[in-house]
């Protein structure tokens, strides 16, 4: 008699399911801000801090610099996770670092990161990767340029102001300094009530863009652009911007034609503009964000697949799982179309024994309906039918 004799019935469970591909969280904001009077325990310098309920820390954000105004603008739009990196205000003594130097930061001798570079460590330190980046009120040209490098490394998208620009012409000229797909330029700023000072003050439009972007992702999806969505709790715009829906020669249209997003008032205040500073393929904000979020969604889902046996069955499961996810996004209206496949040309017999496999997928993102033309025709074709009933009367 064998040792494993059994007289009866038993069930051994296994699964035959594709690995589920979950969406990455696209709503996490990465904010770099200045506030010397902020609570140092809540907001330590040069350290990514996860805030899960922004409104609860407004009282600790101080009154100076940009931290309070930025968090207030974000919280007026959405309740979302915000990763805050607070940097010191620049000193006035000789040899002191400039504010832009402190905000940009870098890698220190001990290997630690300061300034916006601290955002690179956020995922390891607080468990979330920032996807929506901004440095409201301090986004000078050099800060914006470096922020876009950080955005590329994080597969994130950045929003920046046309720093120092007082006119439309200056904003158009400023825009020419940038060419990346990872950023949108905004001009001018909003006016809002500051409950701390009791005055109506200029508030950074970039901070509102960060909050509104997260709100749109939550309510509609990352395939919907920032443009033409009402912004909460603003009272005005800091510069005169002529806009009319049908006006081809408006200020807003001129700014948009030069890839600068502007602000308008119609049924409340809104951002108006869809464009990045890339003039080639990733011309729309949603094109860049779709590419980023799709890439991370597909790649991160393969964590448990890496180092599994490289068999035809496992590769087939990878392809099937990706196709299922892509078709789900198509059905949800977040992609126009998409497909994944295994091509033997990409996988020669010399590669498989080395533990290497390649699968391909493509997709068509959803463009914004930016230019709608309706053809109106004056015709006489309806007269006869309209008056035919009067015949013989």
UniProtKB/Swiss-Prot annotation:
A cellular component term from Gene Ontology for this protein is:
virus tail, sheath
Query: Domain of life of the organism in this record?
Result: Viruses
Q: Where in the cell is it found?
A: Virion
Q: Name one Pfam family in it.
A: Gp18_domIII_N
> Which of UniProt's keywords are assigned here?
Viral contractile tail ejection system, Viral genome ejection through host cell envelope, Viral penetration into host cytoplasm, Viral tail protein, Viral tail sheath protein, Virion, Virus entry into host cell
Question: Which InterPro entries does the record cross-reference, listed alphabetically?
Answer: Gp18_domIII_N, Phage_sheath_subtilisin, Phage_Tail_Sheath_Structural, Tail_sheath_C
| Tagged with keyword 4Fe-4S | no
Q: Name one GO biological process term.
A: symbiont genome ejection through host cell envelope, contractile tail mechanism
> Which residues does UniProt call coiled coil?
none
Regarding protein family, the annotation reads:
Belongs to the myoviridae tail sheath protein family.
Q: What does this protein do?
A: Forms the virus contractile tail sheath.
**What is the protein named?**
Major tail sheath protein
